[in-house]
Every structure is written in structure tokens, then in C-alpha cells.
């Protein structure tokens, strides 16, 4: 690809240059690449990148396949087509119906796609005990299967935050296991602040995507959490620009859809590229948004 604008999120600048891709991987990125240096010239295809901007692969920091109403394969294809190359996935709804076997089903189908999935083991099934029907309660034994047999990366959102704060035995056992194994533990704690937030974080939770005000986002950020800005098909109440202006540039600020983007919107507007466009429209600098 010749003469493309290349978004460099490490140095926070747009550079003009060439990109050489071989066998589906970036072989070289430079201000100028001489075609004479390239082996197998007979296979070389040159694309004029003038007027185009090359971005790094986008990552959805937290999402759910099931909310899209698509199969794992179709979901992954939609993401790849829109520049999302990796996603942190919580198979909560599949586990809600079929237990850990539901998660395995989603994982197996996605293996045949180009998306890089980061699967997290769902700890809070049911999410609201006593108010919903499901396959049964997820216990430590289920989480161990998902992590140790299925190869999941961490513990998905601890969405029953009341049980976390109350240190309810079965959920505490799961979170303690995650801490002992050094696993990432995602959060889900709308409106949880002050001493309750301290207890929630001490349980091992390291992220949150459910804040409803900038002040809530800032408190979680200042207490060391990864704060995930959510964008998609929903109208979100907290301003991304105001939060970023107050928090500053940080690797502890992420962007996700949380699965809250319809298949129709993905087809018409995109996926993480749509989420990026939304926060840029709010006033966030494009390079900061991409990072």
C-alpha cells in the first residue's frame, strides 16, 4: 500500500508512508518501500493509499456475541469487515441457557474465523438470583472448566455487584480463584461509589463499563480501575470528551460496544469504527480515540 496516511498511536501523529503486507501479516511499514527490495515480485499487488488512513486493528474491550442475534461466525465476520480484529467476549447469555457448554459452543464456531477472541468466564449466572430462570447457578467448578479446560483468559463481568460487596460465599470463591490464578476480572457496577466501590475493587475487579456520570467514571479511574467507555446503538449519558479532558491520556481508558449495537447498525454504520466515530463527534481527538 503506497502513500497512505498511517495513524501512529504511540507517537500521536499521522504519518505518510508505505505498508508491505505478506501472507496476511504486516512485513514492513516505512516512509518509502522500494518494490525492488521485495522478494516474490510476481505476487506483488500495489494499492494506491492516497486519501486513505490506515489504523491499527481495533479492539472491543467488552462485548457479547449473543446480543447481536448473530452466530459466532457471522458476528466475527461483521467485526473483521469493520476493522475490529479482536474482542473481549463474555458468553453470559449462552452460559445462562446451557451452562459452560454454551460458552464452548460459541468458542468452537469462532475458531474458524479471523477474529482474535479473548474469552472470559461468566461468573454471575443468574445475574439476578430469584428474578430469572436459567440453567442453574454458575459455581467455581464451572468457572474452572471454562478457564482450565476451555482456555478462557479471565473472569467476565462480576455483574451481581451486591453479592460481591456482601462477600457472598459462592461468588467470593470464584473471585478469589481468579486472584490466585492472576486472572483479569471484569466489572459491572453502575452507581457503585465510595466504600462500596473500595470493597468491589478489593474483591479483584479491575474494570467497569457501566458508569452513568463523568464523576462516577473519574472516581473509578482514580481508584485504579480500567474505565471502559461504551458506545453503540444506545444513547449514553456520560460525555467521553469531558471524561477524557479531566482524566487525561491513559492506558486505563478503553472503548467497547458491550454488545449494545444491533446487527442493522453494524451493517449500516460499522462496529468499533462506529464507536470511534461517535466519540470523535463528541469532540474527542481522533488519535486519542483510536488509542
Task: Describe each model-derived feature in a short phrase.
Residues 84-85, 151-152, 199-207, 221-228, ...:
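Glycine-enriched alpha-helix->loop->beta-strand junction motifs that scaffold or abut catalytic
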Amino acid at each position: 500500500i503506497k502513500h497512505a496516511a498511517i495513524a501512529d498511536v504511540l507517537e500521536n501523529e499521522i504519518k505518510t508512508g508505505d505498508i508491505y503486507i505478506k501472507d496476511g501479516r504486516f512485513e514492513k511499514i516505512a516512509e518509502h518501500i522500494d518494490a525492488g527490495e521485495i522478494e516474490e515480485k510476481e505476487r506483488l499487488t500495489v494499492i494506491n493509499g492516497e486519501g486513505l488512513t490506515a489504523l491499527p486493528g481495533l479492539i472491543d474491550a467488552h462485548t457479547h456475541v449473543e446480543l447481536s442475534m448473530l452466530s459466532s461466525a457471522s458476528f466475527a465476520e461483521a467485526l473483521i469487515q469493520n476493522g475490529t480484529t479482536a474482542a473481549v467476549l463474555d458468553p453470559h447469555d449462552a452460559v445462562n441457557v446451557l451452562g459452560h457448554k454454551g460458552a464452548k459452543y460459541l468458542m468452537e464456531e469462532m475458531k474458524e474465523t479471523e477474529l482474535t477472541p479473548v474469552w472470559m468466564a461468566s461468573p454471575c449466572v443468574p445475574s439476578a438470583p430469584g428474578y430469572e430462570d436459567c440453567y442453574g447457578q454458575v459455581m467455581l467448578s464451572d468457572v474452572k472448566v471454562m478457564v482450565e479446560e476451555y482456555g478462557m483468559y479471565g473472569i467476565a463481568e462480576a455483574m451481581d455487584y451486591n453479592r460481591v460487596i456482601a462477600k457472598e460465599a459462592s461468588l467470593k470463591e470464584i473471585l478469589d480463584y481468579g486472584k490466585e490464578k492472576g486472572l483479569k476480572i471484569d466489572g459491572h457496577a453502575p452507581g457503585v461509589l465510595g466504600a462500596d466501590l473500595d470493597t468491589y475493587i478489593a474483591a479483584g475487579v479491575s474494570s467497569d463499563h457501566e458508569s452513568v456520570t463523568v464523576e462516577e467514571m473519574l472516581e473509578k479511574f482514580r481508584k485504579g480501575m480500567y474505565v471502559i467507555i461504551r458506545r453503540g446503538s444506545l444513547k449514553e449519558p456520560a460525555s467521553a470528551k469531558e471524561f477524557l479532558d479531566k482524566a487525561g491520556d491513559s492506558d486505563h481508558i478503553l472503548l467497547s460496544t458491550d454488545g449494545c449495537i444491533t446487527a442493522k447498525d453494524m451493517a449500516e454504520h460499522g462496529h468499533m469504527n462506529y464507536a470511534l466515530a461517535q466519540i470523535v463527534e463528541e469532540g474527542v481527538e481522533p488519535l486519542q480515540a483510536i488509542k
